[in-house]
Amino acid sequence: MIFEKKTHIVEFVRRPNRFQGYVIIDGKEELVHVPNTGRCKEILIPGCRALIREENGQNRKTRFSLIGAYKGKNLINIDSQIPNKVVEEALINKKINGLEKYTKICREKTFGNSRFDFKLEDPLNNEYYLEVKGVTLEENGLCRFPDAPTERGTKHLLELIEVKNNNIGAGVLFLVQLENVKSFSPNDDTDPKFAAALKKAKSSGVDIFVYKCSVSENHIELSQSVELKL
């Protein structure tokens, strides 16, 4: 997907809370919105090059949103609204192995008391529920999720197992929002409950997809699958 709004590279200064950050724009420090509640502490390091996007909402307190940052040569997207858009585009273009047959794509659909990112249907009306998780944590080519404990993420995995137990297709897709990665693993050290739930989901027949992205300062798209190590 191409970013419709104009972007700029600036210097990151600090992040006082989850939703706010400060960057240097035209030699002056300015407040920007951070559309990501994760820690991102390995990415948003004072002095790093950051990617900001121009915004034009009348009720906004800031002119820009901080949507990415460079870690070495890797540009990493941190806009939490982007992964579902990237995956939807990939589903439409049949780029996800194993999900090509699904022709109907619906966002934010429920199964029982659970809400998932996507509900897919094939021409025979067979259903498939897909949850998407954006991945930004990387070290020496190994990506991990989550970067902070996530009860919600664990709950999603257990709910996908319930979907599968009802003989309905279910999967989770980890979208690695950077290039130059070799493999993906659950972050046992940070959230052992999530790691255990992911392994249980795998053994229960829930599909686990891992894809990396092609990322630039004006676009991001799903590119290639990444090795899963459980």
From Swiss-Prot:
Molecular functions per Gene Ontology: DNA binding
A Pfam family this chain is assigned to: SfsA_N
Entry-linked InterPro entries: SfsA (IPR005224), SfsA_C (IPR040452), SfsA_N (IPR041465)
Domain of life: Bacteria
Signal sequence, start to end: none
NCBIfam families for the chain: sfsA
Similarity comment: Belongs to the SfsA family.
HAMAP family cross-referenced by the UniProt entry: SfsA
Full protein name: Sugar fermentation stimulation protein homolog
Gene encoding the protein: sfsA
